[in-house]
Regions:
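ABC transporter TMD-NBD coupling linker
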Residues: 1-32, 72-79, 122-132, 208
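The feature captures the beta-strand-to-loop junction immediately N-terminal to the Walker
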Residues: 53-55
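ABC-family ATPase nucleotide-binding domain "signature/switch" substructure
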Residues: 62-65, 94-103, 111-114, 128-134, ...
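Short beta-strand immediately N-terminal to the Walker A/P-loop
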Residues: 50-51, 99
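Helix-to-loop junction immediately C-terminal to a conserved catalytic motif
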Residues: 68
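Conserved ABC transporter NBD signature motif
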Residues: 76-83, 93
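C-terminal boundary and immediately downstream tail of ABC-type ATPase nucleotide-binding domains
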Residues: 244-259
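Conserved beta-strand
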Residues: 23-26, 34-45, 50, 76, ...
């Protein structure tokens, strides 16, 4: 389900992204002047699982919203394979990026219909594979009608964790080069979380997978951690390398989380 975007809808076409996303001196401020992101410079290669980490209000979701073009930078440039998104139509951007929201936006139809909403051309095999990767087959197989089971208004026959897994499966079935997930493991038990993180690592072998994460068990598995604080990138690296730096902001954050 797409949000409206501030980006132009009629612009140059976008080539299929094959290499990386680049953010150059990117800042974002609300109309009232509140600065959320300040001079962000990042290169995010395809093939990596990237975790965006930081305290509440650090700008994590704002940074993630820039990738599918839900908002546009107040300053700076975002490029997909050196193509400036400022000159790219929002429909072309959305062909490259899937965003899975923390809120579960489900149709009161069947599981199959919910998956087809994301990718009307998806085959049965693709849908089942997406459900398997997201850990959703565990509960889908318990329903008499399987993937054709109707889940009720807003998915009210499902638990919060089941809704989350189905939302993730819907994101996976689009098979876009960039997949962004907001708190994908928040409502999952440790076993399901471990399985999903492993699936995301496998999914990232050909895609850029970006997760906004709070759980250390998810964060430490990322190939690259971006630690945000007060709208600025304080640290970039993997868990081991950042924890090895005595003065890193990420290390201090982790130590506070662990008490």
């Amino acid at each position: 389900i797409d949000y409206t975007s501030e980006l132009d809808t009629e612009s140059d076409p976008l080539l299929i992204i094959e290499k990386s996303v680049e953010l150059e001196n990117v800042s974002f401020a609300y109309p009232d002047g509140r600065q959320v992101l300040k001079d962000v410079n990042l290169t995010l290669p395809l093939g990596e699982l990237v975790a965006i980490v930081g305290p509440t209000g650090a700008g994590k979701t704002t940074l993630a919203y820039l990738l599918p073009g839900y908002i546009k930078p107040s300053a700076g440039r975002i490029r997909f394979d050196n193509i400036d998104l400022a000159h790219t139509g929002v429909n072309e951007i959305r062909k490259q990026v899937t965003y899975v929201f923390q809120e579960h936006m489900l149709l009161s139809e069947s599981i199959r219909d919910n998956l087809l909403l994301a990718n009307p051309q998806a085959t049965g095999e693709q849908m089942l594979e997406a459900c398997r990767l997201a850990g959703a087959m565990e509960f889908i197989e318990q329903f008499p009608d399987g993937i054709d089971s109707v889940i009720g208004k807003g998915g009210d026959t499902l638990s919060v964790g089941q809704k989350q897994r189905l939302s993730i499966a819907r994101g996976l079935v689009r098979e876009t080069p960039i997949l962004v997930l907001d708190e994908p493991t928040a409502a999952l038990d440790p076993k399901t979380e471990n399985s999903l993180v492993e699936a995301l690592r496998n999914t990232a072998q050909g895609r850029l997978v970006v997760v906004i994460a709070h759980r250390l068990s998810t964060i430490r598995e990322a190939d690259r951690i971006i630690f945000l604080e007060e709208g600025q990138v304080r640290d970039v690296g993997n868990h081991a390398s950042l924890m090895a730096q005595p003065t890193s902001a990420y290390r201090k954050f982790v130590e506070l989380q662990n008490g």
